[in-house]
């Protein structure tokens, strides 16, 4: 049987079998390439000597699934308990659970040593804020923000912060009917932190405490978290070229998400413009960012982007830490009683509680540290790409261009480094000899190095 193609010049008969040759060749080539890639990743890849699941060594799918499973932090811990402190969790990706790893990956590099770059798979380039900027711009942004996060700045900002804390306490009394009704503390902590950071960033709050609900912008942040996780997992698969992915992502997002994102970018710019138009020198983040230093100043776009990132990075993380502390104090009444006694024997009235005076509450500080160990606000990691020439991480040489990471939750719950890691015990931070072997140096909830959290103080 054949296909007859005719024209004025000639008649050509093409066998049907030949018409199937091209797709068949593509299938055979694709299968052959997949088999070759599996063999290469298992036996010839530069990371072949590192332990881990065989499927993870040949495919990125297991790690992408781990990212969207909702229990990735526990899965990563299980992998480290099975394979050791270094696990190959994807073909070119190493996960570390070792006390030295975080400093080796994110710590200060020696003079002349290149910085480990942000993971290019999930990190966009040319971002105009302190989170995603390159080394030079990050230094410039951090310098512009430094005064806004200094100890003196916190003292100057205390009246602003205290106003919202007092409003929070008043709202809690009112909505809990003086402690007789249950309330959602996670929401109320978020109301307060978003109002505080909003005021310090834009000169006005979001009004969450007053309205007892989330501002639409704040609500969008929570609604989009899952979508961003799915997008990150899709990027990690690297099935679609990055340039093409950037084009199709807006169409793959839930309906209206791109529009809302653009709208909120517009609102952020509007809030920054409104704050700048006041000409105020109040002790907030915007005053710090707009103060010229050594002739340097930030563009309007940089001001807008950094102010917006402060809202996300400074609000939800703080609320998460406070929520964790409240949750575990509720689970462990003996710890709650000790903390209550410390506070009530230290202060005679609420007016005595200040940013300076609370620094002497040793048990309270231990409670906060233990809460962040048990439930770190950044439970997963911030991947890096090893610099040119490779690096020694946790005592092992890692080739250049390897994605490396430390997940905080698995590290903080690893029984190799912590006594009773799954128990909430603030005393471990107060010199109790029972916990003398805890590797407290690996407790870095604010990260470490030149890109550690500027709000650590």
Task: Report residues per predicted region.
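Conserved cytochrome P450 K-helix/beta-meander segment immediately N-terminal to the heme-binding cysteine loop
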Residues: 387, 406-434
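Conserved cytochrome P450 K-helix E-x-x-R motif and the immediately C-terminal K′/meander segment
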Residues: 69-76, 238, 352-394
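N-terminal targeting/anchor module and adjacent flexible "hinge" preceding the catalytic domain
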Residues: 1-104, 121
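Cytochrome P450 heme-thiolate "Cys pocket" and heme-binding signature region
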Residues: 147, 308, 313, 355-356, ...
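Cytochrome P450 catalytic domain signature, combining two hallmark sequence patches
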Residues: 103-123, 417-419
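Cytochrome P450 catalytic-domain helical core, especially the substrate-recognition surface
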Residues: 2, 56-69, 117-202, 216-273, ...
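Cytochrome P450 catalytic-core helices
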Residues: 317-342, 456-457
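Conserved cytochrome P450 catalytic core segment spanning the I/J/K helices
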Residues: 184, 256-321, 361
